[in-house]
Swiss-Prot record:
GO terms for molecular function: ATP binding; nicotinate-nucleotide adenylyltransferase activity. This is Probable nicotinate-nucleotide adenylyltransferase. Belongs to the NadD family. Pfam families: CTP_transf_like. It comes from Anaeromyxobacter sp. (strain K). One of its GO terms (biological process) is NAD biosynthetic process. The lineage of its organism: Bacteria, Pseudomonadati, Myxococcota, Myxococcia, Myxococcales. It comes from the Bacteria. Pathway: Cofactor biosynthesis; NAD(+) biosynthesis; deamido-NAD(+) from nicotinate D-ribonucleotide: step 1/1.
Length: 187
């Protein structure tokens, strides 16, 4: 895993992707010495949450990624759909390391995730396969050298959409248009 370009992975449900995701990607590109950021939507949520169809979330990530040079989308978890460990970050990292032996990987996580790593499958393996980059989250202890991202959540965005409320400014414009055209997250 030495040498090569370092790719930062920003994983999540992206249900839907929002501007704080793009802020995290931009910050990693600008300050963490990574060549690219790959948005990595989970195929199936590891803790069983209901999600919009994978293809819709993948397309919303593609639309969001267009806003920033150096941000791309990785659908690797779909390649692992039949794997019983799909959605487990350690398994996804193993798959990507085998598929892209010329790359090094970093994993962008929010400060809120650090308190939950005991619940993760093989967090030790995740740390062995990727440099962990932590971004701050409002309402959590500060991370030295990292900005606190705004407290924007996909859960709140879905709730607002279900109530028919405006979410402009919280999600990229092209993502919002896609959500409206597809009728996603309506109550």
């Amino acid at each position: 895993m030495s040498g090569g370009r370092e790719i930062a992975l920003l994983g999540g449900s992206f249900n839907p992707p929002h501007v704080a995701h793009l802020m995290a990607a931009w910050w990693a590109l600008a300050t963490q010495g990574v060549s690219e950021v790959w948005l990595l939507p989970t195929f199936r949520h590891p803790f069983g949450k209901d999600l919009a169809p994978f293809e819709d979330r993948l397309e919303m990530c593609r639309l969001a990624a267009r806003a920033l040079r150096g941000v791309h989308v990785c659908g690797a978890e779909a390649e692992l759909a039949a794997d019983p460990l799909v959605g487990k970050t350690a398994r996804t990292l193993e798959h990507l390391a085998a598929k892209h032996p010329d790359h090094r990987f970093a994993l962008i996580v929010g400060a809120d995730i650090l308190a939950e790593t005991a619940k993760w499958y093989r967090w030790d393996r995740v740390q062995a396969l990727a440099r962990v980059i932590v971004v701050g989250r409002q309402g959590h202890p500060p991370v030295p050298g990292a900005p606190d991202l705004p407290a924007i959540s996909s859960t709140e965005i879905r709730a607002r959409l279900a109530r028919g409320e405006d979410v402009r400014g919280l999600v990229p414009e092209k993502v919002l248009r896609y959500v409206e055209e597809k009728g996603l997250y309506r109550g």
